[in-house]
């Protein structure tokens, strides 16, 4: 059995302010650093064979906290990057609704296919699943931790559950540094945990 642990990165100021980040390279804030340490303490109690991370700073900082606790060297993986939100980077929900009212309404309904000037959701899905499959193949029968982003986690969960990208609104975003666990059991993928934040008591 192969276990892939998907950890969302710790909090940034833009997370706290409700702003879209996408490929914007924002660092962790003080709360995010504390969340990363809590995740690292939990991972120190797990048997983990490999550590992967998105190459964006908020993920690599989170992975660095895990490295200090486990001794595993993070492997930067561009395929784990957050979705490119294009022209929405830095905007909060209210600003996006004012600038792109039609798009925003359809986004809330799950009927848009991309962000304005950004990545197609189908491309995000293919990228996320490609990274997931490579990690799972490389660590067959082992456990690997991948520090990534909400968009990546949701794309993988939708695939595991057999849902189309338009079902995104049905998958709640997890708190920063929450854990989602997927197991590959023979040829079947099983969602074992979604947005587990038990290690973040008092930090979310």
Give residue spans per PLM region.
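Active-site metal-binding loops of divalent metal-dependent hydrolases
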Residues: 10, 150, 197
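Generic beta-sheet signal
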Residues: 4, 142-148
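Glycine-rich phosphate-binding loop signature in dinucleotide/nucleotide-binding domains
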Residues: 44-47, 135-142
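Domain-level recognition of soluble alpha/beta enzyme cores
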Residues: 164-188
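Phosphate-coordination/substrate-recognition cap region in phosphate-metabolizing enzymes
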Residues: 38-104
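Short glycine/proline- and acidic residue-enriched helix-loop micro-motifs
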Residues: 103-123
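Loop-to-helix element that buttresses phosphate recognition and phosphoryl-transfer chemistry
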Residues: 8-66, 116-129
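Acidic, His/Gly-rich catalytic cores of divalent-metal-dependent hydrolytic chemistry
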Residues: 192-204
């Amino acid at each position: 059995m192969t276990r892939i642990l998907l950890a969302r990165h710790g909090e940034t100021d833009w997370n706290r302010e409700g702003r879209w980040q996408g490929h914007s390279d924002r660092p962790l804030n003080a709360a995010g650093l504390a969340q990363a340490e809590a995740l690292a303490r939990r991972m120190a109690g797990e048997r983990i064979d490999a550590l992967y991370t998105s190459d964006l700073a908020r993920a690599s900082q989170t992975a660095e906290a895990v490295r200090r606790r486990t001794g595993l060297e993070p492997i930067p993986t561009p395929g784990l990057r957050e979705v490119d939100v294009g022209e929405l980077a830095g905007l909060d929900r209210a600003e996006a609704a004012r600038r792109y009212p039609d798009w925003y309404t359809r986004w809330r309904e799950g009927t848009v296919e991309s962000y304005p000037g950004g990545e197609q959701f189908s491309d995000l899905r293919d990228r996320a699943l490609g990274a997931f499959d490579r990690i799972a193949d490389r660590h067959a029968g082992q456990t690997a931790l991948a520090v990534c982003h909400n968009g990546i986690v949701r794309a993988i969960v939708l695939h595991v559950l057999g849902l189309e990208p338009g079902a995104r609104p049905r998958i709640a975003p997890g708190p920063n540094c929450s854990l989602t666990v997927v197991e590959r059991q023979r040829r079947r993928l099983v969602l074992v945990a979604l947005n587990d934040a038990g290690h973040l008591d008092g930090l979310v």
